[in-house]
């Protein structure tokens, strides 16, 4: 950047950034003190506009395709220079932050933003270290220029906006995008590429720890309950979305939370509710005339969000780290109403369901998605963020589970008694009771019933849960129709899994079509 031509605010405080955002017309204050900002037409991630620079140091390690689209190194150089020139006379906000709450596995990153509220988001979601880059690692750079308009013909992009990762130069370019989630997910993708080479499993999961130091992980796509279920008043939060699992422990990749706000209530989600206050960024949340947020209003998007630092949560693990997990929960949102609320998995079944990543897009975080809920298979419960081939992550998961002896569970936070539109969704208290049973160890060696088509072991009793709910066939009025839907789901699993080169033990661990 050309210093002297523009005003640069370096490592600004929360109060300064809120003040700048209000003065510059970037947002408004709510009655609870949070800052509301609107992102315009792009109210979610833009996967079609995300690229990775194809260069010799990383190209052999990346699974190229529609998720990881290749970008020309020369075109990147030109576009980066044009964005720098565009920002040269603009007021800018810059912070030196870190990604990864681990002394060995952190990445230092300098974040430069055109908007004050984007900088506040970055400082909420990334880690503000006591001492920046104590191991003197090469520093990553993020530039976020939301008002820069890309020209596909000139810039080599797919539209007027883009996200580009460059592993060789340690650069992330965001241009033409106001949705702040792109910043956090771009650095998550960076860590998802770097960590496996160090023997660390990067995970799209939340994590918490009990009073006795027992760690639980919750894997799942957006909207399946990662943030809600890990924000447990009886446990201490490590983080809500991105973690690394190294030999000896897990660590948060972030320093904050990015919670979905749609239908947020104080009763069901008190931890998140209380975290929304001064310093929090609310994205696309609608307010009433008294500036009170209306979390039921989805007129701008289903994907309304709250971004706040972990310090806003009273019951948190202050070092953002935990021991290796005794329990690992795969959260799936089953729109067919076929899966049980909880199943106990073998390690082969864990690998099968981790690779499958069966769930639904709920209030999708991607632009272009309607509010319609549809089933999907998202490898590793986060396909859009993993640059390496899926097998790399599955092998690391198997290794970690085996070496520590973690027990894996499949928990359905979706529908029962019929598909979406006919059946009803499991309520949060029911799922919380199941999670309580998991973390207490109650389900470790219990009596189970085997569901043949789904090839799943289901406990016959769970404290605090109606036993009729545990075997899904009991909740369907038409048992023959249930069998038909179960068969359809088993076929969908088998068809999706055909692409994976795995052992017979893993392949045979799935549903039986």
Swiss-Prot record:
Pfam families in alphabetical order: PEPCK_ATP
Keyword annotations of the record: ATP-binding, Cytoplasm, Decarboxylase, Gluconeogenesis, Lyase, Manganese, Metal-binding, Nucleotide-binding
Record localization: Cytoplasm
GO biological process, one term: gluconeogenesis
Cofactor note: Binds 1 Mn(2+) ion per subunit.
UniProt keyword Metal-binding present: yes
Covalent S-S links between cysteines: none
GO terms for cellular component: cytosol
Positions with a binding annotation for Mn(2+): 185, 204, 241
Main location: cytoplasm
Gene3D superfamilies: 3.90.228.20, Phosphoenolpyruvate Carboxykinase, domain 1 (3.40.449.10), Phosphoenolpyruvate Carboxykinase, domain 2 (2.170.8.10)
Chain sites annotated for binding substrate: 45, 179, 185, 305
Domain of life of the organism encoding this protein: Bacteria
Functional description taken from the UniProt entry: Involved in the gluconeogenesis. Catalyzes the conversion of oxaloacetate (OAA) to phosphoenolpyruvate (PEP) through direct phosphoryl transfer between the nucleoside triphosphate and OAA.
Family annotation (HAMAP family): PEPCK_ATP
Similarity section: Belongs to the phosphoenolpyruvate carboxykinase (ATP) family.
Record's protein name: Phosphoenolpyruvate carboxykinase (ATP)
Organism: Shewanella baltica (strain OS195)
Gene from which this protein is expressed: pckA
């Amino acid at each position: 950047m050309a210093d002297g031509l523009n005003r640069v605010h370096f490592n600004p405080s929360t109060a300064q950034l809120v003040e700048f955002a209000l003065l510059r017309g970037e947002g408004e204050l709510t009655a609870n003190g949070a800052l509301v900002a609107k992102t315009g037409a792009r109210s979610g991630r833009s996967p079609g506009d995300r690229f990775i620079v194809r260069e010799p140091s990383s190209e052999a390690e990346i699974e190229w395709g529609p998720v990881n689209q290749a970008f020309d190194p020369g075109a990147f150089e030109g576009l980066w220079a044009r964005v720098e020139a565009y920002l040269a006379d603009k007021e800018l906000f810059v912070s030196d932050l870190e990604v990864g709450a681990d002394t060995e596995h952190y990445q230092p990153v300098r974040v430069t933003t055109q908007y004050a509220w984007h900088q506040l988001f970055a400082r909420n979601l990334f880690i503000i270290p006591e001492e920046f880059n104590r191991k003197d690692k090469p520093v990553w750079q993020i530039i976020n220029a939301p008002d820069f308009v890309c020209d596909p013909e000139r810039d080599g992009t797919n539209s007027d906006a883009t996200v580009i990762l460059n592993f060789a130069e340690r650069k992330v370019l965001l241009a033409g995008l106001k949705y702040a989630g792109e910043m956090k997910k771009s650095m998550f993708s960076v860590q998802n590429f770097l960590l496996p080479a160090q023997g660390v499993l990067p995970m799209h999961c939340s994590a918490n720890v009990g009073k006795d130091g027992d760690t639980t992980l919750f894997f799942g796509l957006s909207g399946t309950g990662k943030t809600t279920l890990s924000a447990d008043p009886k446990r201490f939060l490590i983080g809500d979305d991105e973690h690394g699992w190294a030999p000896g422990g897990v660590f948060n990749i972030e320093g904050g939370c990015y919670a979905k706000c749609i239908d947020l209530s104080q009763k069901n989600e008190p931890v998140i509710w209380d975290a929304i206050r001064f310093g929090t960024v609310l994205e696309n949340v609608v307010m009433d005339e008294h500036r009170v947020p209306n979390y039921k209003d989805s007129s701008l998007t289903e994907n309304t969000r709250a971004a706040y630092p972990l310090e806003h949560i009273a019951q948190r693990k202050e070092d953002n780290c935990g021991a290796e997990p005794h329990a690992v929960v795969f959260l799936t949102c089953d729109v067919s109403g076929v899966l049980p609320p909880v199943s106990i998995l073998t390690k082969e079944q864990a690998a099968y369901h981790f690779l499958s990543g069966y769930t639904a897009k709920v209030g999708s975080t991607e632009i272009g998605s309607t509010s319609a809920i549809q089933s999907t298979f998202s490898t590793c419960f986060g396909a859009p963020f993993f640059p390496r081939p899926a097998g790399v992550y599955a092998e690391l998961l198997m290794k970690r589970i085996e070496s520590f002896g973690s027990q894996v569970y499949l928990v359905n936070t979706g529908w029962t008694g019929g598909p979406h539109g006919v059946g009803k969704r499991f309520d949060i208290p029911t799922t919380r009771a199941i999670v309580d049973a998991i973390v207490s160890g109650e389900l470790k060696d219990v009596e189970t019933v085997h569901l043949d088509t789904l090839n799943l072991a289901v406990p016959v009793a769970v404290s605090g849960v109606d036993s009729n709910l545990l075997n899904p066939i009991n909740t369907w009025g038409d048992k023959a129709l249930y069998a038909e839907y179960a068969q359809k789901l088993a076929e969908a699993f088998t068809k999706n899994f055909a692409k994976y080169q795995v052992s017979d033990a893993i392949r045979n661990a799935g549903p039986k079509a």
